[in-house]
């Protein structure tokens, strides 16, 4: 099993949590980014910097992640592409993406995009906090356990 991370948009605390699990459970972590980042100094972690361009990191993740892998991303359209391919996806706040909830998640995302474009709502998500980190860690633990049992 491999865990892929859409590294440009993922909070550092979530990346650190994945690496902590990787060291304990012995799986590979692949950080995919559109710009260079500092790679954590662990053998289980690889940094893949893709050429810059719209959706280049997303396209790389969809092309290379396989069923049985997990992708950490907050990009709902990316998660939809992954779920359709049979790849597990989880956002850094611990909310899973699957075929049952993708329609609703896409509709909500599109609604808020439209409202933002019209100036009716502003800003984005609240800052990533301790509660988010704990919720993510719990969801990650459950999902990794489920994925490891299915291999």
Swiss-Prot record:
Domain of life (superkingdom): Bacteria
Pfam families attached to this UniProt entry: DUF188
Family: Belongs to the UPF0178 family.
Protein's name according to its UniProt entry: UPF0178 protein PST_0536
Biological source species: Stutzerimonas stutzeri (strain A1501)
